[in-house]
């Protein structure tokens, strides 16, 4: 596995800045919140195996999530709800979730590194890094925390809204999910601003 560049060696070797990695999960699903995380890693407590959460198994993500929570200097998550996604669109909701994650850090970073090409409004300097979750350890850590927390929420919602298969596909528009939507209807946890859900509501 390619070793990811740590926040310390890449960004703050000379200045000693505290750098937070920030990422979000859940832009594509038809159901559930978008979840973001922010992580400031501790250079004295390295974490082996950090990588883009999509490249890790469920078991690896869960184990790393626990290790990140135990070893990071600071971490926090932030959500944007289905209602917020429908009101302000998924891009703005993703940025809002990232804002909330950074605001939740118990230690204020000097710099935030954001996965992707959009930067939320923050109280500190920030830099966007395309595919940052595959390049920067702190962003990879954030992607893992966000993914694990969102998956746990979809597992919980699967119990409340049985029949949609949420625990399996995590809200993504799989054939099973679309079939269940047609048979069982749209729920309060479905994103009405998304086209497949809109079409069902319109009777198409």
UniProtKB/Swiss-Prot annotation:
Q: The RNase H type-2 domain covers which part of the protein?
A: 17-204
One Pfam family from the record:
RNase_HII
What the record notes about the co-factor is:
Manganese or magnesium. Binds 1 divalent metal ion per monomer in the absence of substrate. May bind a second metal ion after substrate binding.
Entry keyword annotation includes Nuclease = yes
| Highest taxon of the lineage | Bacteria
Reactions performed catalytically: Endonucleolytic cleavage to 5'-phosphomonoester
Question: Taking the first listed entry, what is the main subcellular location of this protein, grouped into a coarse class?
Answer: cytoplasm
Identify the residues that bind a divalent metal cation: 23-24, 115
* Keyword annotations from UniProtKB, A to Z: Cytoplasm, Endonuclease, Hydrolase, Manganese, Metal-binding, Nuclease
InterPro entries linked to this entry: RNase_HII, RNase_HII/HIII, RNase_HII/HIII_dom, RNaseH-like_sf, RNaseH_sf
The protein's Enzyme Commission number: 3.1.26.4
Q: Does the keyword DNA-binding apply?
A: no
> Which GO cellular component terms, listed alphabetically, does the Swiss-Prot or TrEMBL entry include?
cytoplasm; ribonuclease H2 complex
Subcellular locations according to the entry:
Cytoplasm
Gene Ontology MF: a single term = manganese ion binding
Cofactor needs: Mn(2+); Mg(2+)
Family stated for the protein in its record: Belongs to the RNase HII family.
Purpose of the protein: Endonuclease that specifically degrades the RNA of RNA-DNA hybrids.
Name used for this protein in its record: Ribonuclease HII
Q: Which organism is it from?
A: Hahella chejuensis (strain KCTC 2396)
Q: What is the lineage of its organism?
A: Bacteria, Pseudomonadati, Pseudomonadota, Gammaproteobacteria, Oceanospirillales
């Amino acid at each position: 596995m390619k070793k990811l560049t740590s926040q310390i060696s890449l960004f703050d070797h000379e200045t000693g800045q505290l750098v937070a990695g920030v990422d979000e999960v859940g832009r594509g699903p038809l159901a559930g919140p978008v979840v973001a995380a922010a992580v400031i890693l501790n250079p004295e407590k390295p974490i082996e195996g950090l990588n883009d959460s999509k490249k890790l198994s469920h078991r690896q993500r869960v184990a790393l999530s626990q290790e990140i929570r135990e070893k990071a200097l600071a971490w926090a998550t932030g959500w944007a709800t289905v209602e917020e996604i429908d009101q302000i669109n998924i891009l703005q909701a993703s940025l809002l979730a990232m804002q909330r994650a950074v605001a939740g850090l118990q230690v204020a970073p000097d710099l935030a590194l954001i996965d992707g090409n959009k930067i939320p409004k923050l109280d500190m300097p920030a830099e966007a890094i395309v595919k940052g979750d595959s390049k920067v350890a702190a962003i990879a850590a954030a992607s893992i925390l966000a993914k694990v927390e969102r998956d746990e929420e979809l597992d919980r919602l699967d119990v409340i809204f049985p029949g949609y298969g949420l625990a399996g596909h995590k809200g993504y528009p799989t054939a099973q999910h679309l079939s269940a939507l047609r048979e069982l209807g749209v729920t309060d946890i479905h994103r009405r601003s998304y086209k497949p859900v809109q079409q069902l509501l319109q009777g198409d």
